[in-house]
C-alpha cells in the first residue's frame, strides 16, 4: 500500500507540472554580447534566435538570424551572396550605413559586412549582416535591433551611436558553430 501511495503522489506531481506548463529552463543555443539566445523559428536554411523574454516573433527587440547558403563554397560565391543581400536591402528602401570586407588571408577566407537601417511606420530596425565561410560552407549572421513607435528615428540614432561599433565588432569576432542550428 505504501508503494501505491508513493506512486500516486509522484504521478500527481508529474501531472501537475505537465498541466501547469512548468518546464526546466532550456539551455541557450549560443551567447552573443553576453545574452543567451534561444531558437525560435526555422524554415529551410533560415533560423531565428532571440534572447529570453523575447519569444514573441511579432514584437522583439534583439534577434539573430542565421542563413545557410548551400550553394556557397568559396570566396567568390560568398561575395556574390553578400552583394545579392545588399541589393535586396537597397530595393527594400533600407538606408545602408556601411559595408566592409575583411580580406582573405592564408588561413582565413574573406568576410563581408553590411550595416543597414529599415524604416517602417510602426518601427525602425538596424541590421548588421556578416557573411562568412565556415568549413567551406557559406553563412550570414544578421544581428537586428528594433525600436517600436512612430517616432523611433531619434532613439535609433542614439542606440546606433552608443552600440553600433560594439555590435559590429562583436559580430565580426563571434565564433559561431553550425552545430547550434536545429
Describe each PLM feature range.
Residues 65-105:
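Mid-chain, structured segments of secreted extracytoplasmic proteins
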Residues 41, 89-93, 171, 175-178:
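Sec/Tat-exported extracytoplasmic proteins
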Residues 35-73:
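Secretory pathway targeting signatures of secreted, lumenal, and periplasmic proteins
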Residues 8-16:
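Bacterial N-terminal signal peptides
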Residues 111-182:
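Short, well-structured beta-strand
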Residues 47-51, 107-117:
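Ser/Thr-rich, low-complexity intrinsically disordered terminal regions
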Residues 1-8:
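Bacterial N-terminal signal peptides that target proteins for export
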Residues 23-40:
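Short N-terminal segments immediately surrounding and downstream of signal-peptide cleavage
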Amino acid at each position: 500500500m505504501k508503494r501505491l501511495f508513493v506512486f500516486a503522489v509522484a504521478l500527481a506531481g508529474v501531472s501537475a507540472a505537465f498541466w501547469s506548463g512548468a518546464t526546466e529552463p532550456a539551455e541557450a543555443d549560443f551567447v552573443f554580447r553576453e545574452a543567451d539566445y534561444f531558437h525560435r523559428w526555422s524554415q529551410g536554411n533560415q533560423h531565428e534566435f532571440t534572447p529570453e523574454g523575447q519569444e514573441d516573433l511579432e514584437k522583439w527587440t534583439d534577434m539573430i538570424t542565421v542563413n545557410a547558403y548551400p550553394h556557397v563554397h568559396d570566396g567568390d560565391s560568398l561575395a556574390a551572396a553578400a552583394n545579392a543581400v545588399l541589393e535586396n536591402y537597397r530595393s527594400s528602401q533600407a538606408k545602408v550605413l556601411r559595408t566592409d570586407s575583411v580580406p582573405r588571408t592564408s588561413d582565413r577566407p574573406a568576410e563581408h559586412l553590411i550595416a543597414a537601417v529599415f524604416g517602417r511606420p510602426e518601427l525602425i530596425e538596424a541590421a548588421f549582416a556578416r557573411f562568412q565561410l565556415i568549413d567551406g560552407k557559406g553563412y550570414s549572421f544578421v544581428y537586428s535591433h528594433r525600436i517600436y513607435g512612430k517616432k523611433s528615428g531619434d532613439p535609433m540614432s542614439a542606440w546606433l551611436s552608443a552600440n553600433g561599433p560594439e555590435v559590429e565588432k562583436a559580430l565580426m569576432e563571434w565564433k559561431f558553430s553550425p552545430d547550434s542550428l536545429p
